[in-house]
A protein has these predicted regions:
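Non-catalytic alpha-helical scaffolds and adjoining flexible linkers that form interface surfaces
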Residues: 1-20, 25-239
Length: 239
């Protein structure tokens, strides 16, 4: 079936000398993998490998057989051109990190318009913003909701957080229970927008602490999720 849809590229793997396997999150059908034959060849004119950089928002015409095999793309073009993301090393590094997180966390091969629009609008916000130091933390916290693993937002007055149950609680020193500054800082991100002025989160250590917590939380609740390799690059750049 020929489908025309918006799509967000997640990553691609080299396949043979001239081809790649591209993973995309499509607006029409959720997660899809495509075999792009000859796309790395200098002779290939219809599709350019440069179109498929991580988290590029595309408009594609694709053949979807929906049999669990690799699909094919007939044509692709930029749907929303970024002005700053690919030119700003800090934004670009954040995008590489988030593309890896999304690749590891999105597994559903079905339509999820809410998740698609969240990712798209988040990227547009990042591209237009000059104050994005906490963007990736906001993104991860919001992503939990779309993945169905967002923590309960009741009992916010309690000082502990049980990572296994995803609830705020009285701190009890059990394996999955945390408290202190980390819990207080996590609460700041619940229900806030990207442009929230969180002056308390003003150092690399605080951001790193929150990111490590969120990654661990995702590992607990998403069995196949493992630590993104791009984290170390992110930390190195922002230190």
């Amino acid at each position: 079936m020929l489908v025309s849809t918006e799509s967000i590229s997640l990553n691609y793997l080299k396949y043979s000398e001239t081809s790649v396997i591209l993973k995309c999150f499509t607006k029409s059908d959720g997660l899809k993998s495509y075999l792009l034959k000859g796309v790395r060849s200098t002779k290939k004119k219809s599709l350019n490998i440069g179109l498929f950089q991580p988290l590029t928002i595309l408009e594609i015409d694709a053949n979807h057989k929906n049999k669990g095999n690799l699909e094919s793309i007939r044509s692709a073009k930029i749907s929303k051109a970024f002005k700053t993301i690919h030119l700003d090393i800090y934004k670009n590094t954040i995008v590489l990190f988030l593309s890896e997180v999304l690749s590891k966390s999105i597994k559903e091969e079905e339509k999820n318009t809410r998740l698609f629009e969240f990712i798209k609008e988040s990227l547009i916000w990042l591209d237009q913003s000059s104050n994005f130091s906490n963007f990736h933390i906001h993104f991860l916290v919001k992503l939990l909701n779309y993945l169905g693993i967002s923590p309960e937002k009741t009992n916010l007055n309690l000082g502990g957080f049980n990572m296994l149950e995803g609830v705020f609680c009285i701190y009890d020193q059990s394996e999955y229970c945390i408290n202190g500054r980390l819990v207080d800082n996590f609460k700041l991100f619940l229900g806030t927008d990207f442009d929230a002025n969180l002056s308390e989160i003003n150092s690399l250590n605080k951001r790193k602490e929150l990111i490590e917590f969120l990654i661990k939380y995702m590992q607990i609740h998403l069995p196949e999720f493992n630590r993104p390799k791009s984290l170390n690059v992110l930390y190195e750049l922002f230190k």
